[in-house]
Protein backbone atom coordinates (compact mmCIF):
# COMPACT_ATOMS: atom_id res chain seq x y z
CA UNK A 1 0.00 0.00 0.00
CA UNK A 2 1.46 3.36 -1.01
CA UNK A 3 1.90 6.33 1.27
CA UNK A 4 -0.94 8.83 1.19
CA UNK A 5 -1.48 11.99 3.21
CA UNK A 6 -5.24 11.52 3.07
CA UNK A 7 -5.46 9.06 5.95
CA UNK A 8 -5.19 11.84 8.50
CA UNK A 9 -7.79 14.15 6.98
CA UNK A 10 -10.65 12.81 9.09
CA UNK A 11 -8.79 13.85 12.21
CA UNK A 12 -8.75 17.45 11.04
CA UNK A 13 -12.40 17.49 10.07
CA UNK A 14 -14.12 18.32 6.82
CA UNK A 15 -14.88 21.92 7.72
CA UNK A 16 -11.36 22.76 8.83
CA UNK A 17 -9.92 20.94 5.83
CA UNK A 18 -12.10 22.93 3.47
CA UNK A 19 -11.01 26.20 5.05
CA UNK A 20 -7.36 25.20 4.84
CA UNK A 21 -7.69 24.24 1.19
CA UNK A 22 -9.23 27.62 0.47
CA UNK A 23 -6.48 29.36 2.44
CA UNK A 24 -3.74 27.39 0.71
CA UNK A 25 -5.19 28.08 -2.73
CA UNK A 26 -5.44 31.81 -2.04
CA UNK A 27 -2.10 32.19 -0.25
CA UNK A 28 -0.22 32.73 -3.51
CA UNK A 29 -1.95 33.17 -6.83
CA UNK A 30 0.35 30.77 -8.68
CA UNK A 31 0.73 28.09 -5.99
CA UNK A 32 -1.97 25.51 -5.43
CA UNK A 33 -2.24 22.13 -3.65
CA UNK A 34 -3.30 20.29 -6.82
CA UNK A 35 -0.41 21.55 -8.96
CA UNK A 36 0.90 18.03 -9.70
CA UNK A 37 -2.40 16.16 -9.87
CA UNK A 38 -2.18 15.85 -13.64
CA UNK A 39 1.58 15.76 -14.18
CA UNK A 40 2.88 13.73 -11.21
CA UNK A 41 -0.06 12.34 -9.23
CA UNK A 42 2.08 10.07 -7.04
CA UNK A 43 4.48 12.75 -5.85
CA UNK A 44 3.30 12.45 -2.22
CA UNK A 45 3.51 8.65 -2.34
CA UNK A 46 7.05 8.72 -3.68
CA UNK A 47 8.34 11.27 -1.18
CA UNK A 48 6.40 9.76 1.72
CA UNK A 49 7.60 6.22 1.12
CA UNK A 50 11.21 7.38 1.05
CA UNK A 51 10.81 9.20 4.37
CA UNK A 52 9.17 6.14 5.92
CA UNK A 53 12.13 4.07 4.76
CA UNK A 54 14.71 6.57 6.01
CA UNK A 55 13.06 6.78 9.43
CA UNK A 56 13.77 3.09 9.96
CA UNK A 57 17.47 3.83 10.37
CA UNK A 58 17.52 7.57 11.10
CA UNK A 59 14.84 8.81 13.53
CA UNK A 60 16.32 12.32 13.26
CA UNK A 61 15.59 12.70 9.58
CA UNK A 62 12.05 14.07 9.96
CA UNK A 63 13.22 17.00 12.08
CA UNK A 64 16.22 17.51 9.80
CA UNK A 65 14.02 17.83 6.70
CA UNK A 66 11.74 20.34 8.42
CA UNK A 67 14.78 22.39 9.46
CA UNK A 68 16.14 22.25 5.91
CA UNK A 69 12.90 23.73 4.58
CA UNK A 70 12.98 26.47 7.22
CA UNK A 71 16.59 27.36 6.40
CA UNK A 72 15.76 27.42 2.69
CA UNK A 73 12.76 29.72 3.01
CA UNK A 74 14.52 32.27 5.22
CA UNK A 75 17.17 32.93 2.57
CA UNK A 76 15.61 34.64 -0.47
CA UNK A 77 12.46 32.52 -0.25
CA UNK A 78 11.58 28.85 -0.71
CA UNK A 79 13.61 28.18 -3.85
CA UNK A 80 15.84 25.20 -2.95
CA UNK A 81 18.92 27.43 -3.01
CA UNK A 82 20.12 25.66 0.15
CA UNK A 83 20.47 22.42 -1.82
CA UNK A 84 23.00 23.78 -4.32
CA UNK A 85 26.63 22.71 -3.99
CA UNK A 86 29.57 25.04 -4.62
CA UNK A 87 30.09 26.15 -8.21
CA UNK A 88 32.30 28.55 -10.11
CA UNK A 89 29.47 31.10 -9.93
CA UNK A 90 28.58 31.05 -6.24
CA UNK A 91 29.42 29.65 -2.83
CA UNK A 92 26.98 27.17 -1.35
CA UNK A 93 24.68 28.11 1.53
CA UNK A 94 25.75 24.83 3.11
CA UNK A 95 29.01 26.56 4.11
CA UNK A 96 27.23 29.38 5.95
CA UNK A 97 27.61 29.31 9.74
CA UNK A 98 23.97 28.36 10.50
CA UNK A 99 24.23 25.36 8.14
CA UNK A 100 27.84 24.17 8.24
CA UNK A 101 28.18 20.76 9.86
CA UNK A 102 24.57 20.87 11.06
CA UNK A 103 22.17 21.04 8.10
CA UNK A 104 21.49 17.49 6.93
CA UNK A 105 19.14 15.41 4.81
CA UNK A 106 20.61 16.41 1.45
CA UNK A 107 21.16 12.79 0.47
CA UNK A 108 17.51 12.03 1.21
CA UNK A 109 16.39 14.89 -1.04
CA UNK A 110 18.71 13.47 -3.72
CA UNK A 111 17.01 10.11 -3.38
CA UNK A 112 13.58 11.71 -3.77
CA UNK A 113 14.67 13.65 -6.83
CA UNK A 114 16.05 10.55 -8.55
CA UNK A 115 12.80 8.66 -7.91
CA UNK A 116 10.66 11.55 -9.15
CA UNK A 117 12.77 12.05 -12.28
CA UNK A 118 12.13 8.40 -13.10
CA UNK A 119 8.38 8.73 -12.53
CA UNK A 120 7.79 12.28 -13.78
CA UNK A 121 10.84 13.62 -15.64
CA UNK A 122 11.32 17.36 -15.41
CA UNK A 123 8.10 17.98 -13.51
CA UNK A 124 8.70 18.33 -9.77
CA UNK A 125 10.98 21.10 -8.53
CA UNK A 126 13.49 20.61 -5.74
CA UNK A 127 11.80 23.47 -3.88
CA UNK A 128 8.50 21.58 -3.90
CA UNK A 129 10.21 18.33 -2.94
CA UNK A 130 11.64 20.02 0.14
CA UNK A 131 8.28 21.61 0.98
CA UNK A 132 6.38 18.33 0.65
CA UNK A 133 9.07 16.45 2.57
CA UNK A 134 8.77 18.82 5.51
CA UNK A 135 4.99 18.41 5.64
CA UNK A 136 5.14 14.61 5.47
CA UNK A 137 7.91 14.56 8.08
CA UNK A 138 5.67 16.42 10.51
CA UNK A 139 2.74 14.13 9.74
CA UNK A 140 4.73 10.92 10.20
CA UNK A 141 5.98 12.21 13.56
CA UNK A 142 2.46 12.65 14.93
CA UNK A 143 1.80 16.18 13.74
CA UNK A 144 -0.96 17.58 11.54
CA UNK A 145 -1.58 17.26 7.82
CA UNK A 146 -2.20 20.34 5.70
CA UNK A 147 -2.68 21.08 2.00
CA UNK A 148 0.69 22.19 0.65
CA UNK A 149 0.56 24.95 -1.97
CA UNK A 150 2.78 23.78 -4.84
CA UNK A 151 4.22 25.08 -8.09
CA UNK A 152 7.53 26.55 -6.94
CA UNK A 153 10.54 26.57 -9.23
CA UNK A 154 14.21 26.34 -8.33
CA UNK A 155 16.77 29.09 -7.94
CA UNK A 156 19.77 29.13 -10.27
CA UNK A 157 22.03 30.62 -7.62
CA UNK A 158 22.85 30.31 -3.92
CA UNK A 159 23.13 33.11 -1.36
CA UNK A 160 25.97 32.34 1.03
CA UNK A 161 26.30 35.84 2.50
CA UNK A 162 22.57 36.17 3.12
CA UNK A 163 22.44 32.76 4.77
CA UNK A 164 24.97 34.04 7.29
CA UNK A 165 22.78 36.99 8.27
CA UNK A 166 19.13 36.09 7.63
CA UNK A 167 18.80 32.90 9.65
CA UNK A 168 17.89 33.32 13.34
CA UNK A 169 20.68 32.44 15.76
CA UNK A 170 20.15 30.05 18.69
CA UNK A 171 21.66 32.84 20.82
CA UNK A 172 19.12 35.50 19.80
CA UNK A 173 16.99 37.31 22.34
CA UNK A 174 13.31 37.89 21.66
CA UNK A 175 13.77 41.27 19.99
CA UNK A 176 16.33 39.81 17.60
CA UNK A 177 14.08 36.85 16.84
CA UNK A 178 11.13 39.09 16.01
CA UNK A 179 13.31 41.20 13.74
CA UNK A 180 14.66 38.16 11.88
CA UNK A 181 11.17 36.82 11.28
CA UNK A 182 9.72 40.20 10.29
CA UNK A 183 12.59 40.79 7.86
CA UNK A 184 11.42 37.86 5.73
CA UNK A 185 7.73 38.74 5.99
CA UNK A 186 6.70 36.65 9.00
CA UNK A 187 5.57 39.54 11.17
CA UNK A 188 2.90 37.87 13.28
CA UNK A 189 3.79 36.85 16.82
CA UNK A 190 2.09 33.55 16.10
CA UNK A 191 4.49 32.94 13.19
CA UNK A 192 7.46 33.08 15.54
CA UNK A 193 5.94 31.06 18.36
CA UNK A 194 4.33 28.39 16.17
CA UNK A 195 7.33 27.85 13.88
CA UNK A 196 9.62 27.66 16.90
CA UNK A 197 7.48 24.67 17.85
CA UNK A 198 9.33 22.79 15.14
CA UNK A 199 11.87 22.23 17.92
CA UNK A 200 9.45 19.82 19.52
CA UNK A 201 11.51 17.09 17.88
CA UNK A 202 15.09 16.76 16.69
CA UNK A 203 18.49 17.48 18.23
CA UNK A 204 20.93 20.34 18.72
CA UNK A 205 24.69 20.30 19.13
CA UNK A 206 26.24 21.12 22.50
CA UNK A 207 28.08 24.09 20.98
CA UNK A 208 24.73 25.88 20.73
CA UNK A 209 23.85 25.08 24.34
CA UNK A 210 27.02 25.42 26.42
CA UNK A 211 27.23 29.26 26.55
CA UNK A 212 24.02 29.43 28.57
CA UNK A 213 25.20 26.62 30.86
CA UNK A 214 28.47 28.22 31.96
CA UNK A 215 28.81 31.81 30.78
CA UNK A 216 25.45 33.28 29.85
CA UNK A 217 25.91 36.67 28.17
CA UNK A 218 29.42 36.94 29.61
CA UNK A 219 28.30 36.62 33.25
CA UNK A 220 30.34 33.49 34.07
CA UNK A 221 27.06 32.10 35.37
CA UNK A 222 24.31 29.96 33.83
CA UNK A 223 21.17 31.37 32.27
CA UNK A 224 18.90 32.11 35.27
CA UNK A 225 15.85 30.97 33.31
CA UNK A 226 17.14 27.37 33.23
CA UNK A 227 15.39 24.85 35.43
CA UNK A 228 18.04 23.86 38.06
CA UNK A 229 17.52 20.13 37.56
CA UNK A 230 17.65 20.54 33.80
CA UNK A 231 20.84 22.59 34.14
CA UNK A 232 22.53 19.73 35.97
CA UNK A 233 21.46 17.28 33.26
CA UNK A 234 22.61 19.54 30.43
CA UNK A 235 25.98 20.08 32.08
CA UNK A 236 26.37 16.33 32.26
CA UNK A 237 25.61 15.99 28.55
CA UNK A 238 27.58 19.09 27.52
CA UNK A 239 30.57 19.53 29.85
CA UNK A 240 32.52 22.77 29.68
CA UNK A 241 35.22 22.55 27.00
CA UNK A 242 33.72 19.24 25.90
CA UNK A 243 32.86 17.98 22.41
CA UNK A 244 30.69 20.67 20.86
CA UNK A 245 29.19 18.31 18.27
CA UNK A 246 27.53 16.02 20.81
CA UNK A 247 23.77 15.93 20.17
CA UNK A 248 21.11 16.75 22.75
CA UNK A 249 17.35 16.27 22.37
CA UNK A 250 15.33 19.46 22.04
CA UNK A 251 12.51 17.75 23.92
CA UNK A 252 13.54 15.47 26.79
CA UNK A 253 10.04 13.99 27.15
CA UNK A 254 9.02 13.03 23.59
CA UNK A 255 12.18 13.64 21.53
CA UNK A 256 10.98 12.22 18.20
CA UNK A 257 7.28 13.14 18.39
CA UNK A 258 5.70 16.23 16.90
CA UNK A 259 3.49 17.45 19.73
CA UNK A 260 3.06 20.43 22.07
CA UNK A 261 5.46 19.20 24.75
CA UNK A 262 7.97 21.82 23.57
CA UNK A 263 5.79 24.57 25.02
CA UNK A 264 5.30 22.76 28.31
CA UNK A 265 9.07 22.46 28.51
CA UNK A 266 9.42 26.22 28.05
CA UNK A 267 6.98 26.83 30.88
CA UNK A 268 9.12 24.58 33.07
CA UNK A 269 12.40 26.31 32.20
CA UNK A 270 13.48 23.41 30.01
CA UNK A 271 14.00 25.09 26.66
CA UNK A 272 17.22 23.71 25.21
CA UNK A 273 18.59 26.78 23.43
CA UNK A 274 18.36 30.42 24.43
CA UNK A 275 16.18 31.49 21.50
CA UNK A 276 13.55 28.94 22.53
CA UNK A 277 13.40 29.85 26.21
CA UNK A 278 13.22 33.56 25.33
CA UNK A 279 9.65 32.99 24.13
CA UNK A 280 8.51 32.34 27.70
CA UNK A 281 11.13 33.88 29.96
CA UNK A 282 11.22 37.41 28.52
CA UNK A 283 9.25 39.49 31.06
CA UNK A 284 5.96 40.83 29.71
CA UNK A 285 6.47 39.34 26.25
CA UNK A 286 3.45 38.91 23.98
CA UNK A 287 4.75 35.43 23.18
CA UNK A 288 4.02 34.13 26.69
CA UNK A 289 0.22 33.79 26.27
CA UNK A 290 0.74 31.82 23.05
CA UNK A 291 3.23 29.48 24.74
CA UNK A 292 0.66 28.89 27.48
CA UNK A 293 -2.12 28.34 24.96
CA UNK A 294 -0.17 25.93 22.76
CA UNK A 295 1.00 24.01 25.82
CA UNK A 296 -2.56 23.61 27.08
CA UNK A 297 -4.24 22.76 23.77
CA UNK A 298 -2.26 20.90 21.11
CA UNK A 299 -5.00 21.39 18.51
CA UNK A 300 -4.57 25.16 18.81
CA UNK A 301 -0.83 24.75 18.28
CA UNK A 302 -1.40 22.52 15.26
CA UNK A 303 -3.71 25.07 13.63
CA UNK A 304 -1.25 27.88 14.27
CA UNK A 305 1.62 25.77 12.95
CA UNK A 306 -0.27 24.95 9.76
CA UNK A 307 -1.03 28.61 9.18
CA UNK A 308 2.58 29.64 9.79
CA UNK A 309 3.97 26.86 7.58
CA UNK A 310 1.76 27.88 4.68
CA UNK A 311 2.81 31.51 5.15
CA UNK A 312 6.49 30.55 5.32
CA UNK A 313 6.16 28.25 2.31
CA UNK A 314 4.90 31.17 0.27
CA UNK A 315 7.86 33.44 0.92
CA UNK A 316 9.05 34.80 -2.45
CA UNK A 317 8.46 31.66 -4.52
CA UNK A 318 9.77 31.45 -8.06
CA UNK A 319 6.86 30.59 -10.36
CA UNK A 320 5.91 30.56 -14.03
CA UNK A 321 9.06 30.98 -16.10
CA UNK A 322 11.23 32.14 -13.20
CA UNK A 323 14.13 29.91 -12.20
CA UNK A 324 14.06 26.34 -13.44
CA UNK A 325 13.15 22.75 -12.57
CA UNK A 326 16.53 21.30 -11.65
CA UNK A 327 17.42 17.86 -12.93
CA UNK A 328 19.77 17.42 -9.97
CA UNK A 329 19.00 19.36 -6.80
CA UNK A 330 22.70 19.98 -6.14
CA UNK A 331 23.50 21.78 -9.40
CA UNK A 332 21.80 24.16 -11.80
CA UNK A 333 20.85 22.73 -15.16
CA UNK A 334 23.39 22.95 -17.98
CA UNK A 335 22.91 26.11 -19.98
CA UNK A 336 22.13 25.38 -23.64
CA UNK A 337 23.62 27.82 -26.14
CA UNK A 338 22.75 27.75 -29.84
CA UNK A 339 25.66 28.52 -32.19
CA UNK A 340 26.08 28.68 -35.96
CA UNK A 341 29.38 27.73 -37.63
CA UNK A 342 30.91 29.19 -40.78
CA UNK A 343 28.96 26.76 -42.95
CA UNK A 344 25.64 27.85 -41.47
CA UNK A 345 25.19 24.68 -39.45
CA UNK A 346 23.31 25.33 -36.19
CA UNK A 347 24.10 23.27 -33.08
CA UNK A 348 23.52 23.37 -29.33
CA UNK A 349 26.35 23.28 -26.82
UniProtKB/Swiss-Prot annotation:
Origin, by domain of life? Eukaryota
According to the UniProt record, list the residues that bear Pyrrolidone carboxylic acid.
30
**rRNA-binding among the record's keywords?**
no
Q: Which CDD domains match?
A: secretory_peroxidase
Cystine connections: 40-120, 73-78, 126-329, 206-238
Any binding details for the cofactor? Binds 1 heme b (iron(II)-protoporphyrin IX) group per subunit.
| Cofactor(s) needed by this chain | heme b; Ca(2+)
Any idea which GO molecular function terms this record carries? heme binding; lactoperoxidase activity; metal ion binding
**Which Gene3D superfamilies does the record associate with it?**
1.10.520.10, Peroxidase, domain 2 (1.10.420.10)
| Tissues showing expression | Mainly expressed in roots.
Membership in a protein family: Belongs to the peroxidase family. Classical plant (class III) peroxidase subfamily.
- How is this protein named in the record? Peroxidase 22
Gene from which this protein is expressed:
PER22
